[in-house]
Amino acid sequence: IKGFTNLFYGGSIVLLVLVLVIGKTVNGAQGWIDLGVISLQPAEIAKVATIMMMGQKLEEMEGNINTVKNFFTLAIYAVIPAALIVIQPDMGMTMVLFFMVLGVYFIGGLDKRVILYGLGSMLLAVVLLWNSGLIQDYQKTRITSFMNPDTDTSDSGYHLRQSLIGIGSGGFFGAHNSYSNDGTGGFASEYVPEVETDFIFAQIGEQWGTIGAIILLSFYGILISRMIKIAKNSKDIFGRCVSIGMVSYFFFAITQNI
């Protein structure tokens, strides 16, 4: 797939621009292109394309990332798609891309102090952009509710509070059947509405109990460890970058949803 990197990256940028013109808005972000039968989210394509492009460029640099020129060259390829995703605005997807890029810089041997500065800069950016309009009200609510779920358990903190109750109700072996009886084939939950979205782990804890949650986390651990092994065994820089980028993506996604 290395030979298609430029085309893949360029195409993803075109799609990110296109979605700002003709895209439809879902959950406050204009990030989807309606193709009739299915909908396409260009940001998902851009995440993989960006990691591929950075891997290709890092390979051309022979892995030498600790120069000002090389550092900012790689950064440009990450900033372009990130900026287009921020405009949608989709801060969640931007965060995912950030951690994937951070993984590439890490595997590239970037000075660890620079990585720490990058994390600090991200936190500072959130503070500075808090009232800029780029961070939507619902995103602010999710952040504040996560930090203190007991602030408003009837509104902003409701889902998080209910998810904890649901997990606790599962006990060791689980509480009740996993699927609803309304003919939709959807998940059932006595405590969390729309549990199949960001609170799927609460569903596992409620339906399958502690044992089910442990099994799921064990599978995640095996998946991540295998992906890291693949990254270590990659014969070129491009392969390592793509592999570790995907490790970063899965790790962040798993952490975010648990």
Could you tell me what each predicted segment is?
Residues H159-H176:
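Extracytosolic (periplasmic/ER-lumenal) interhelical loops and adjacent juxtamembrane/interface segments
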